[in-house]
Amino acid sequence: MDEEQMWKGFFFKLQELKMNPPTEHEHQLQDGDDGFFEKFGSLLRQKSQIDEGVLKSSLAPLEENGSGGEEDSDESPDGTLQLSQDSECTSIDTFATESTLASSSDKDISTSVLDSAPVMNVTDLYEEILFEIFNNIGCENNEECTNSLVEFVQDAFKIPNATHEEIYEAARLKEPPNVRLNVEIIKAENLMSKDSNGLSDPFVTLYLESNGSHRYNSSVKPATLNPIWEEHFSLPITENARDEVLIVEVWDFDAAETVKEKVNKILDVKGVKGLSKLMKEIAVTASSGKHDNELIGRAAITLKSIPVSGLTVWYNLEKGSKGRSRGSLLVNLALSAEKNKSVAVQEHKNLLKLLLMYELETSQVANYWWSGKFSPNAELIRSQHAAQSGLTPFDCALSQWHAYSTIHETHKLNFTLFNSILDVVVPVITYMQNDSEDVKTFWDGVKRLLPSCFAVLRKLRSKNTSDKNIIRALNEVLDILKKIKELEVPESVDIFPKSVYGWLHTNDTDETCNIDTAIEDAINTGTREWLEHIVEGSRQSKNTETDDEKLQYVIKLIQMVRSDLQRAMEYFDKIFYHKIQLNYSAVLYLFYDSKLAEICKSIIIEVCNNIKRLDVPDDQFEYLPNLENVNMGTTLFEVYLILKRYVQLGESLCSEPLELSNFYPWFERGVTHWLDISIIKALSRIQKAIDLDQLKAVDETVKYSSSAVDTLSIFYQIKIFWQQLDWPEVEGSYIFVAKIVNDLCRCCIFYAQQMSRRVENIFIADDNNKNFILSEEWCIAINNMDYIRQSLPSFIKELSIDDIIKRLGEYRTNLEAERCASTIKTVIENALDTERNQIVELIEIVARKMAPPIRRYLAEGAEVLAKDSNSMDQLMMYLESSLATLYDTLNEINFQRILDGIWSELSIIMYDLIQSNLDKRRPPAFFQNLNNTLQTMMDCFKMGNLQTSDIKILSSIQSRLRLYSLETSDLIHQYYLERLENQKSQESSPYGQLTITAQLTDTGLLLNILNARNLLPMDSNGSVDSFVKASFMPTSRFNDVPTVKTNVHNKSCFPLYDQEFRINLSDHQRSEKNSLIVFSIKDKDLFGMSSQYIAESYISFADLEATPPGEQIMMNLSRPEYTDSESLRALEYRLGDKQAKDFLKKLKNRSFS
């Protein structure tokens, strides 16, 4: 099986199982260790993912001292903040710690609100406002409107009726003010061209219709149809302003030029119309010398159309009754009265304060709500005063800045108001002298406003707020701070007095505080207050806390801090960076870093030091410790994961070194302890999984059972633990992963041993209780063991060992890295070898259990007398049934292994049967039957093409059976065939050589014995009287063929026989290629009574056919040796056979002669 495919299959199987709820089997399996691995693996990872989602929710706010009761809280029942749905109408009590402003008496107003001035009090200001009401400008003056405004002012100023009547009459008798019309000529567009070049040289003339002789002219803008002037004019109005009309004319300036100068302009002429204009100008100049300006167009503006707040509008230019467009002019118009500037500004400041105080009291406006919109009457009075006082937009804005910042100290106003005022004030203030009165007024307002701005930064976690209100207020505050910090603070102004900003860290140093440092200090101060709040609120009594409770406290603390950071990143980071280029969450993290490191380190080290060392079982697994009372929960590891994620967050936010980055050494003892527990619990879980295993395939697509899946699930959870651990230090990482690898290998070995023991006791017999029936359980057990073994490398690869080794080489040396890699590789290989041996051992057990019936059937089937026995059929049925079970259940590799085991056991059986039946002097027919049975088995299961050691052994057994099944003469012949092969392998012989020629003919054999060489001397005189005797083997084939011999040649070691023999042979005799001719050379004694054996040689009919006719054949002479020959051993077992006995006796005599 491809290991990668196997791992993928298992992975998808696990994913499928995880999608379903735990089964009864899983409950039983996890009950023993309370789901130890699931807690540390998948469940803890899922919990981490859930926690990540929870962190994205709003954070429970920090409770303020003086916050309202439950009815003022924006919290939901689950403690999270709910966003306001009606942000425009909801009170924004976000950062208020002060009570709402109470109504004030007249005395309070005059003393705490109005500025001190030698000529200004409430009655004076009241009289001035009444006077402006009676003499308003820019709107219709009717009695009903006047009465409404008078009543409003009396209420706002809190003037008694008696005093009011007196002041009322005095205001009516005053002379009306001198009114002026303030005009700004801004620009014109698309003017009609009046010059020959297609352009004009425009300027503006303006005058009142009642006084046409008093005209005001702007500058000339040469050669343009879209001039920009931006010039101001102030026209006194002597008649009734409502009846006046302002005339605005745009003229084309015609400079005084000579005819020659005009002619020179001919190159600038544009079009036929331009040429015509130039010719006309030349003619006029030449005839009269006049240089008249030409009117482009005019506009008439009635002053009664101008509102009190002024007007900026485009007017179309006209001339006569012609409808042709002559362009348009942008003009700004405003009416004002003549008044002392300083007095007017002072009046306006006090008026704004009085109007705002009255607005806040009557409308019951909440803190941070009012954003600058007065009631209609109040707005009319304010704008009328500004108009009649001739105040510029800057004067009004600076007065508002002063008045509103003063009120803001006692009743908080919306920051949008101040932000909009700064847009008007800052561009002007930037260019003023630092010692000017306006600059002082501005910075006084800044000093009054800044404390509330920094309060916003400090109270971002306030209880009485929704996230929308926080963001809205923060945007405005940061805009305000950004605009203020761009200004240069005068040396005489201290905007951060210690009496107000006691929380600034610069108070304890010589550093100069500025807006930027104050912002960071405000953030840190608020963060410190928040941290102190959650630290005190989360911790139980230190004296009664257990280790687990201490860790839960750390988890809760980090989660709340992380939640605060999450909200900072989600809601505030973009705002801070966009507004003031500050990384808000990085500032928070750096503050939290040192504080959390101090808190967490002491707790974690204390908890880890309380851990007791465990007694881990050795590789013999003789006992498994009881861990019922020694069970570290997931809490410590959960703390590690939370800290790891927290540090990763910090590294992404901050470039500075972090104290918490070195948190992992605190957990070394805890991780070691967990790994010790994990191996013990893994072994116990594996044992229980095997006990619960029914040894049935988990489904139809696989061939392994539940215990294999359960074991790999343990590995999977351990892998998840390691990936979650992600130990950063390379040496420690190697130590831990090496232990994990070793533990996984030990688990695999333990599984193989326990699974083997489980199935060894399973014995299913047939109906007669004689034969072992190979059940599916045995096959599943083998598959389980092999599946675990094949899965091990894949799991170990998932631990990223190669990456750790690579990092180790970079940290240390490549040599050390290679040594470490070799160590891990050896551990894995040893485990795989041990598992393989365990599988082979189990396969051998199966084969040994199948051996008795196989032996019995083989023995019964080989009996000569049991010809009608069906033992052979029974044997084949037994094997087919067993092999069918194996084939259907085992995978291909294990099926091949068990086949090898069966045939290996079969070789042992055959050896035993052969040996035992040889001892019993069984006839050759017995061995013939046995051989036939073996051959049938091999043919049936197609074993002939397999090249394994066991098949070679069976082939050897088959050869022995064929040998033992031969008759005695055939055995003797077999022995001589062996001698022939031995003869051919000899290069020389001490007994000499024999030379012949031989040829098979149609009728027989033509044999010519030629000579012999170097015969071994047999006589004392060193000579020999030799002759050659030729016989045919096997004797059973050549009974009718006589033996031939040569004449005796005396006293010669090189006899020349040269004798020819014609021997008749049948066709059958000639066709047998393995037939032999045995040549025996003997020495005849002196008296011719007996002959002494010298040596012999052999040649087969096959060799004769292969030799060309007439070619001499030289054969080495040899003496037969009584060696360890299979043929001789077979003959030795036939002691009751006379032919065998005589042959062996003869052979021994020749061998030792």
From Swiss-Prot:
Organism: Drosophila melanogaster
Compartments it resides in: Cytoplasm; Cytoplasm, Cytoskeleton; Cell projection, Filopodium; Late endosome
Job description of the protein: Essential for tracheal development in embryos. Functions with the GTPase Rab39 and downstream of dnd, to regulate lumen fusion between previously separate tracheal branches (anastomosis). Essential component of secretory lysosome-related organelles (SLs) that are present in the tracheal fusion tip cells (FCs).
UniProt binding sites for Ca(2+) 2: D1019, D1025, D1083, D1085
Record bears the keyword Cytoplasm: yes
Domain MHD2: 869-975
Assembly and interaction partners: Interacts with Cam.
Binding of Ca(2+) 1, residues: D195, D201, D252, F253, D254
One Pfam short name: C2
Protein name: Protein unc-13 homolog 4B
BP GO terms, sorted: branch fusion, open tracheal system; neurotransmitter secretion; synaptic vesicle priming
